[in-house]
Amino acid sequence: MVYQLVAWTDRGQVKLLPELLREYAQPYIERIESLKAFYDEGWDDELGRLTEQDVIALSRSYEEYGRFLRLHGKCQEAFEAFVNAASVCLDDRFKIDSEYGYVLVGVLPKRFHAAESLCLDLIEENPALTRLPKWQRLQERFRELEAPFAEERRMIRRELHANRAFNFGRR
């Protein structure tokens, strides 16, 4: 009887042989590719137009794939999957023109923040990930979306500081 090493643990992470990792990752990749085809097309004759739920499904698929990769010690690949999960939520097709400027509609901003928090968790473990171009592009796109609210946030912060100063020492 011959035994073959297929997996081991290293610093709390399960490591697999590369060919096994590719085999186990295949269902995640296939799901992402099928959803991405519809996402890129934006329209399907049978299903209709692209909806928020389609974008969220694609984002969650990227997240599941990222969690799989992270579990198996592929930190940078997991980070890229999490960045993809966040970036699909910033789709221009789901922006509306409001009195403040262009803003995302529905639950997409919340989904973006959920995926971004996974990225930030990995950045805490490995700060070098912030230098990846994908992460920097994602941050730039998000700043563009948040720009209409910057003045409002500054005003709220100013009022909060004034209120704290006014109430300093009172009980």
PLM segments and residue spans:
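C-terminal leucine-rich, beta-strand-based interaction scaffolds used for sensing/assembly
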Residues: 1-63, 67-77
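Alpha-helical junction/boundary sensor with strong preference for TPR arrays
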Residues: 35-46, 88-89, 119, 126-129, ...
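Residue signature of alpha-solenoid helical repeat architecture, marking inter-repeat boundaries
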Residues: 49, 56, 93-95, 130-133
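TPR repeat positional signature
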Residues: 55, 62, 97-99, 136, ...
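Residue-level signature for tetratricopeptide repeat
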Residues: 68, 103-105, 142
